[in-house]
Amino acid sequence: NVIYNAKPSGPVINIDDYVTFEALEDGFTVRLSRNATEYCIDGDGDWKTLSSGATSPSINNGQTISLRGNCTITSSTSSTGGIGTFTLGKKCNVRGNAMALLYGDSGKDNISLSGKNYAFNRLFYNATNLQNVSENFLPATTLSQYCYNYMFYGCTGLISAPALPATTLQQYCYQYMFRGCSSLTTAPVLPATSLQRYCYQYMFQNCSKLNYIKAMFTTT
């Protein structure tokens, strides 16, 4: 017998093109404080709307939930600017591409945050359930002012951080980015050779397990 319209087994999308949370405990949920997004579970491609400030359906250990959106950056202050802040209900890892929150399906083709001041400000602020972030999560090579400000501030459970490939920096772009990440053992390499005012200010403050930070800039 031929079965028609059968649901395909396994993922039908590349979950690394989106912001994808991997649950490490049963009952994981995610909430973004501002901006509506779309989500799908286990890469099934069945995208559903998640309203601004709403909590996602729960998933269990080993499952994934992927997000995409065309999020609007609100305000222009370090306390309220950005697309919002995630609340993570249980322990998780995050992988994929943060640009999918700004550009949806086109995020994988975009490596510039030019003009996107405060874009990811406070995105994972005090997200103590966050454990690991994939290396390619922040692919932008051109940054904007305050774009990663406070991004992982207070993520005390964060063990591994994403690479930071940007070579074109702006003022305050990394300010407080990993402040208080007391479980972080290895800092991402900082490849930019030309800096901007306060670009690294307090970036790794109170990261008590770091032994060194490799930065490529030169002084004159």
Ranges and model annotations:
Residues 2-220:
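Negatively charged
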